[in-house]
């Protein structure tokens, strides 16, 4: 299919003779490059290329003067099977190094006697390298399935990737149309046409056979298949429409489901929020009760400790009461003894007082008697002076009182309960 067609299936060439005629005409008039001419030109190009690379390696490299052919597009060379002028600095532009440092590892190696395996420059683009390698291949210059008819290719050249117009679709398809042949799974280009006696040299028509029937080419009509294909396309379009409707219905159903799910989600969310609030209240109450429980636990622990201390305190209290009772008894005994001593002292003091009073009375009586006696024998003045001197020397009331008080103080200090 495409570029790989059998040359016998070409209607414009007239079969194998047409191909031979084209090759002969191209070889004589030079309108088409024949395989032998391509090989000769390749040999010359290879020689020029090697010379050019050897010159490019020298320090002083020459560059050809630019002409009107140097600015042409690559499509022009591809259209007429021409080789583009190579630039000696292509390798430096591609790899950033001199051309003599670029190896031949990227070139396609050939078997044995390949004279161009190391001559293809690595710096060229892939399309130019493939085209140059196909031209320089000495093993198979033109495959059998490659169409070399220039005029037929120019007539049939069109972009098969683009869809034809509606008028072309409604027409009966051609036998060699690539789109139809791919749809039906048939390779029309590979099917050889029935050959007639006119295609062979020295062949004459047989008198018993109808020359028109033998030379008539069988035409296959694909109209029914084409209509069936259109019916299938129509059915497929209807199925696509139904699928679109189903998809739209499913989208609407999914939207309704999403809205229902959203409402249910909001309901469950509100319920969850309420439950969370209720659980928060429960937790707060539980926390308060737990704190109270901790406090009661501490109080109970303290109460147990106090209860454990009660027996010891009772024992201590009993001991202290006993000690206090003993002290009280001792104090009471001491009080009694002191009271007895006090009574004794009071009685003794009273006795002493009575003694002192009686003594004082005696002394006063003596004094009176002495005063009466002196008054009789002496004058009043002299008796008075003598009485004063006697009082001053023999008896003094102040000294008597002080001695009595001193005696009382000594008795009080000596008494110890």
UniProtKB/Swiss-Prot annotation:
Tell me, in one coarse class, where this protein mainly resides. cytoplasm
Q: Where in the cell is it found?
A: Cytoplasm, Cytoskeleton, Microtubule organizing center, Spindle pole body
Q: Which residues form a coiled coil?
A: 228-372
Family to which the UniProt record says this protein belongs: Belongs to the BBP1 family.
Q: Which domain of life is it from?
A: Eukaryota
**InterPro entries, alphabetized:** Bbp1_C, Bbp1_N
Kindly state the subunit structure of this protein. Homodimer.
Protein function:
Component of the spindle pole body (SPB) required for insertion of the nascent SPB into the nuclear envelope and for the proper execution of spindle pole body (SPB) duplication. Connects the central plaque of the SPB with the half-bridge. Required for proper localization of CDC5 at the SPB and for proper M-phase progression.
Disulfide bonds, paired cysteine numbers: none
Q: What is this protein called?
A: Spindle pole component BBP1
Q: Name one GO cellular component term.
A: spindle pole body
Q: Which UniProt keywords apply?
A: Coiled coil, Cytoplasm, Cytoskeleton
> Which species?
Vanderwaltozyma polyspora (strain ATCC 22028 / DSM 70294 / BCRC 21397 / CBS 2163 / NBRC 10782 / NRRL Y-8283 / UCD 57-17) (Kluyveromyces polysporus)
